[in-house]
Amino acid sequence: MPFLELTLSCSEVTLPRFQNALDDVGALAVTMLDADADTSNERAILEPGVGEMPLWDRLTMTALFDGDSDALVVLAALEAFDPGLDWSQVAFRMVEDSDWERAWMDLFKPMQFGERTFIVPWNHALPEAADTPEAAVVRLDPGLAFGSGTHQTTALCLRWLDSLAGSGELQGRSVLDFGCGSGILAVAALKLGATHAVGVDNDPQALLATADNAQRNGVDAQLAVYMPQDEPVQTYQVVVANILASALDALADTLAARVAPGGRIALSGILHGQEDDLLKRYAPWFEQLRCERDEDWMRIDGVRRG
């Protein structure tokens, strides 16, 4: 079945008006992307707080309508909400259902992190390299923009977990995934040999996503999720926190207290240039601190002092 696709450039200020207009004329789906993606002006938006919806300054909005929708009706609705609309920033085209499916498949493909960790979308066959007893395969819904493995902050953590598994430091361990998002790190840790994991996030939707992904991957009996205020006060042998540098700084005492003596910690969500302050911040509790870089992003990991 064909669909009518609208592409529109807008700003954070004009976005609400256009959203209302598109809803009024029957948009089936609306997506927003950073219009400055892959440029020097690209701005990363990671884990927002509850009730927050941070957006880019310039956006590319794509809306999908039934194939028999009238493009002129859509244009009239847009003009009613913004008479000064720049029509050169508006484009329509007809797309087949298969085009969307193919684009989806092309965008999200199986990914390997380290020697044995694979993130595989549900709509993909298992790659040959992952079809071995040693492989740790995490199946994810490719609709997850953050926490799908495609961002460097997540990739840095997945490679770290894979390296722990390779050295035998994850088998039989307990894991805390602080700022769990989709739960990809907690689920991967369990697939790599950890016996129990806890996911903590201040977004209730993230906890639902984590629980759902754990169930789909058959590790739900080993994983519990909590809001920060409800998390049991205990220590873990492995702690990973993929949040923002400002939050890592503010939560240093809390995160350090969650790591058992001799346990391992990984901190991610750190832009290059922010790592020195965080290294100093965590040095009182951790030794063997080191950094790994992936493009503009850094990971810090270390061992809890005894």
UniProtKB/Swiss-Prot annotation:
It catalyses: L-lysyl-[protein] + 3 S-adenosyl-L-methionine = N(6),N(6),N(6)-trimethyl-L-lysyl-[protein] + 3 S-adenosyl-L-homocysteine + 3 H(+). S-adenosyl-L-methionine binds at residues 154, 179, 201, 242. It is found in: Cytoplasm. It comes from the Bacteria. Its EC number is 2.1.1.-. It is an enzyme of class 2 (transferase). InterPro entries: Ribosomal_L11_MeTrfase_PrmA, Ribosomal_PrmA_MeTrfase, SAM-dependent_MTases_sf. Keywords: Cytoplasm, Methyltransferase, S-adenosyl-L-methionine, Transferase. GO terms for cellular component: cytosol. GO terms for molecular function: protein-lysine N-methyltransferase activity. Pfam families: PrmA (PF06325). Its main location: cytoplasm. One of its GO terms (biological process) is methylation. Methylates ribosomal protein L11. HAMAP family: Methyltr_PrmA (MF_00735). Belongs to the methyltransferase superfamily. PrmA family. This is Ribosomal protein L11 methyltransferase. It comes from Xanthomonas axonopodis pv. citri (strain 306).
